[in-house]
Curated annotation (Swiss-Prot):
It comes from Saccharomyces cerevisiae (strain ATCC 204508 / S288c). This is Polyamine transporter 2. The gene is TPO2. It holds the Pfam family MFS_1. Cell membrane polyamine/proton antiporter, involved in the detoxification of excess polyamines in the cytoplasm. Recognizes spermine, but not spermidine. Induction: By transcription factor HAA1 in response to acetaldehyde accumulation. It is found in: Cell membrane.
Amino acid sequence: MSDQESVVSFNSQNTSMVDVEGQQPQQYVPSKTNSRANQLKLTKTETVKSLQDLGVTSAAPVPDINAPQTAKNNIFPEEYTMETPSGLVPVATLQSMGRTASALSRTRTKQLNRTATNSSSTGKEEMEEEETEEREDQSGENELDPEIEFVTFVTGDPENPHNWPSWVRWSYTVLLSILVICVAYGSACISGGLGTVEKKYHVGMEAAILSCSLMVIGFSLGPLIWSPVSDLYGRRVAYFVSMGLYVIFNIPCALAPNLGCLLACRFLCGVWSSSGLCLVGGSIADMFPSETRGKAIAFFAFAPYVGPVVGPLVNGFISVSTGRMDLIFWVNMAFAGVMWIISSAIPETYAPVILKRKAARLRKETGNPKIMTEQEAQGVSMSEMMRACLLRPLYFAVTEPVLVATCFYVCLIYSLLYAFFFAFPVIFGELYGYKDNLVGLMFIPIVIGALWALATTFYCENKYLQIVKQRKPTPEDRLLGAKIGAPFAAIALWILGATAYKHIIWVGPASAGLAFGFGMVLIYYSLNNYIIDCYVQYASSALATKVFLRSAGGAAFPLFTIQMYHKLNLHWGSWLLAFISTAMIALPFAFSYWGKGLRHKLSKKDYSIDSVEM
């Protein structure tokens, strides 16, 4: 009998063996086997040496933005982004490298103490409480079983979305961006035919506008459902269920016997379809490494702002030619149905779920019940789920002035877009006498400006990559796009107010859309990346704060836009918004120069990448 066979026979009831030399991936022997000969099969796992060769150290890095929100106290955050030769990393090996909950807790405490020196006394108290919580959560009682083996992607793994062919990843990126356009289109589809709502239900314009606003409100609440669903079951399941419900609830919208039924169903349509807004960015990020995902994310930044513009553009013609409100929703349902089928055909991109399935397959093949992901090993923390999806976003909204200021600007731009949907009917409908179909055509310049901005984002991304090669980047390096776009958004409103005269050809006010479309996409693209980099440790929660505030603004603005233009007249209505937009131009420039100091002074804690030891 060979030496190796002797080891196998002797360790037939053990799940792991220690590789003393640490030169090659060690081997474990499963306690059970499914083979006909009932022979145990040696399976390689990683050693300290092999992990160190891959760059793993005793310090745990910041989890990727797409790491599960429901996981907590990770000792191996690299699991979802790293490829290893064997695809299995024993907890015992990680613990021998110092990756234990208690050791990482001590490191975290030092980081908190360093950050406290730049904070107010209130901030210090907050950090002391968090430090206590960290010690309690990461006590020795919560150390993982050393016999557990975490599953990772193997080197060159075809299951890893990062390894899919480039054309496949970009095809999925375009399709997912169209899904976002579909959802955003649905929110504004009725804005091209509000007269049909008034006529059918015998209500005023204010009541009809609610059919648009309530769906946008649904956008702010839906992520509370779909983010945890995505964490637990994957993107594909979330898209299939949510978009299926969205398609179904368009039927009662089309057949609603009264306004109350229509408004209730529109709100639920917003809740169901919001998965497209809160998950697609993650799906795109799943397919690209952090170094190259910026250009792909630019498509996601483009989509939610172009989608609503297509609504009045298409449905203005339906309203004028047929006068049927129900046809608007049938068309919306058809669009949503097509995207439901397409999104369901896109394979799962979420690494934690892919690895869960891989772990289940390996458990079955080897008979080793201790192969799992770290999320499975720790279990789903409902308290952390609520904290990440609800409590922490609300906490950020009242304690993080930098985040609130940034979100306010995003909210303003998004709100101005929805304001355009109701300002253009006043300007081109009441002043120029155009019908809804021609009013819808006036939104084309916004689309052109947005396409121009999409091309410009590639320039911004290339400049950022140049900075990355030269030095360690800061969150403020992400603000180039906002500095370019901010003046254009304000200029658009000044043009709109200055050209809203009947004796001036329609090209004057319509051209404002070019500048606004260009500025709005650049601002959103830039500030979205800035938020992620400033709050990298809790990026999902910070983005949830942004989605909530943005949707609230988008829902509120349509309710008073028409009245504002009637009370202040066409010029001062636009100029009032122009004054606000002009004042906000200073924000990206101020943050670019003083952002780091402001974050350290005003934030309760430094959540950026700078605060973490790599």
